[in-house]
């Protein structure tokens, strides 16, 4: 169709964080890469060691600390590289590698959201539990979900995706929770404003070889940083 073919099976498992630490440069030094990747190898090795069958029970107020065995984890074993450079964040724009601060209106919405939730106890009813805990939408290494917008690594497991594409659609299926996100290209009608779905209503357009996706009608419980009107990403 004259555009890049995105189809295939992909993984976004990586040790590179979504956002860069404040004051950090865009590229890791080799010493920093060795430290990060070495720490992950050590974590995997420790988690793979056999447990002592003669160990005593955990303390009454303690945590068992093993909700999953190490075999299930797939955090990646290296940092992301762009043109051979080990990047310190997945965000490349803005240049500081961070999500811009909220606007005054965004900050007001955030306060309103948290003020509303604060009137309830954490376990008052299931709707107050996190979406990821309820296996509805899984959140990864940012306040966005694994399926977006924008898409971010889980930093745990199930980092695989299958992409299917034709002239009018790009379909992304996630291993995590087996969610499917459909990006429509060129369809004339958007959803009514009162119809708000998980992952929203995604519309794509090609700008050269870049697929730019505008997502609206985001479910009110799903928005990134309480933003549910429109998110543009590529």
Feature-to-residue mapping (PLM):
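PEST-like low-complexity, intrinsically disordered acidic/proline/serine-rich tracts
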Residues: 1-234
């Amino acid at each position: 169709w004259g555009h890049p073919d995105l189809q295939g099976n992909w993984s976004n498992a990586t040790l590179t964080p979504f956002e860069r630490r404040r004051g950090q440069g865009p590229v890791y030094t080799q010493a920093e890469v060795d430290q990060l990747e070495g720490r992950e190898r050590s974590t995997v090795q420790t988690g793979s060691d056999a447990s002592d069958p003669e160990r005593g029970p955990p303390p009454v107020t303690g945590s068992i600390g093993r909700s999953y065995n190490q075999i299930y984890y797939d955090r990646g074993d290296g940092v992301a590289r762009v043109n051979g450079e080990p990047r310190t964040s997945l965000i490349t724009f803005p240049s500081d590698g961070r999500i811009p601060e909220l606007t005054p209106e965004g900050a007001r919405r955030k306060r309103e959201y948290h003020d509303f939730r604060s009137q309830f106890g954490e376990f008052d009813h299931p709707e107050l539990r996190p979406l990821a805990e309820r296996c509805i939408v899984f959140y990864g290494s940012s306040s966005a979900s694994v399926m977006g917008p924008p898409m971010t690594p889980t930093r745990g497991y199930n980092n695989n995706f299958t992409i299917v594409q034709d002239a009018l659609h790009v379909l992304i299926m996630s291993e995590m929770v087996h969610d499917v996100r459909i990006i429509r290209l060129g369809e004339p009608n958007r959803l009514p404003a009162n119809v708000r779905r998980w992952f929203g209503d995604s519309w794509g357009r090609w700008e050269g070889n870049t697929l730019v996706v505008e997502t609206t009608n985001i479910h009110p419980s799903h928005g990134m940083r309480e933003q549910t009107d429109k998110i543009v990403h590529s």
